[in-house]
Amino acid sequence: MYLPQEIIRKKRDNKELTAEEINFFIQGVAKETVSEGQIAAFAMAVYFNEMTMPERIALTCAMRDSGMVIDWSHMNFDGPIVDKHSTGGVGDVTSLMLGPMVAACGGYVPMISGRGLGHTGGTLDKLESIAGYNITPSNDVFGKVTKEAGVAIIGQTGDLAPADKRVYATRDVTATVDNISLITASILSKKLAAGLDSLVMDVKVGSGAFMPTYEASEELAKSIVAVANGAGTKTTALLTDMNQVLASTAGNALEVREAIRFLTGEYRNPRLYEVTMALCAEMLVIANLAKDEQDARAKLQTVLDNGKAAECFGKMVFGLGGPSDIIENYDNHLESAQIIKPVFADTTGFVQAMDTRDLGMAVVGMGGGRRVASDTIDYAVGLSDMIRLGQTADNQQPLAMIHARNEEQWQQAANAVKAAIVISEKQPEATPEVYRKIRPEDV
């Protein structure tokens, strides 16, 4: 028998906690025998003293096991269960192509996703812009769609990692969000409760990333890879670039359109293509669905070219309550904004840099995202035809097309877009889409 305050005292004094102590504390969080004040004190003690790798693994496992851990064995899947998690960015629509692409190559992708908060878009909000799509199906429907389509993207239910929900809510109001140990446990407890065989992490780097510096992003990626593998789930991470909007669009219905056009081959933004292929290839390799990256990329290109990936997306949407013809007639099922006009730079020159976070906030300002969790979303608004770093902005080439509800909203967004993009006479050096890969042997 332990006392929560003694566990807090031990961490406060910078001593290593045992797995039993961490388990006891997190069970108390889930059962509500540990108070919010005690959670806050624990989080602050961890914030100042950090956790060792064994402590992080114990915390992640305790939070994962605080609720239901999905067991897929009764489904008799004839392939591995694999998933991807991104730390979030702007125009980061990879999940909508990646799930169907990996499914078409023989993987099963039961993806439990989140909503957007702050400048980052949420996969669930994007999918909810499709009329009828149900992000909270029963467990039976979740399993059935995963089996039949190979992929099902849904929202987190209350019975997955409930301790994380309480801990996160407290961290949010006590300035203890930005701590590597706590971030690692929060991300992985939810993902690992989905009963995965393997996981690929997409950790963003740059002006639109969650972590402020390359070094911090790399540290988080290494922590996640070490902890997930320590908790028994084969995991690798890719560090990918978020110094510019990843897709050509930012906004919910706009990004769904782009994802469908990507799957059908109508249009593939080159940076989005590279990041999506790199993540999918890594998923196939660690799930033993391909022998190496080259083999994986060839398989992925095949399912894009023969329409199998698009077909998996269509099956998923229909299976979760959406229309049966989303691939063929996507415009009939996605809202459009009343005003769609370009915004031009005030000067001519190369796009030197962009504040991706501010571009994300421009979409939020139009109603396309949330400032607080209770905000409602306008699915139609956002940006499309985004200019890329190194391109020339002039009176022919706009910075973006702005999709707005009215003139005033368009003007506010136009000012925000112009303020977020730096135009210069000098062409910037190209940045890679993928900086590095972190495998278990690297940590």
From Swiss-Prot:
EC primary class: transferase
Catalyzed chemical reaction(s): thymidine + phosphate = 2-deoxy-alpha-D-ribose 1-phosphate + thymine
Any one of the GO BP annotations: pyrimidine nucleobase metabolic process
This protein's encoding gene: deoA
EC number of the protein: 2.4.2.4
Molecular function via GO: 1,4-alpha-oligoglucan phosphorylase activity; thymidine phosphorylase activity
SMART domains the record matches: PYNP_C (SM00941)
Task of the protein: The enzymes which catalyze the reversible phosphorolysis of pyrimidine nucleosides are involved in the degradation of these compounds and in their utilization as carbon and energy sources, or in the rescue of pyrimidine bases for nucleotide synthesis.
Pathway the protein acts in: Pyrimidine metabolism; dTMP biosynthesis via salvage pathway; dTMP from thymine: step 1/2
Domain of life: Bacteria
Subunit record text: Homodimer.
Protein name, UniProt field: Thymidine phosphorylase
Keywords: Glycosyltransferase, Transferase
Organism: Aliivibrio fischeri (strain ATCC 700601 / ES114) (Vibrio fischeri)
Record field: transmembrane: none
HAMAP family found in the cross-reference section: Thymid_phosp
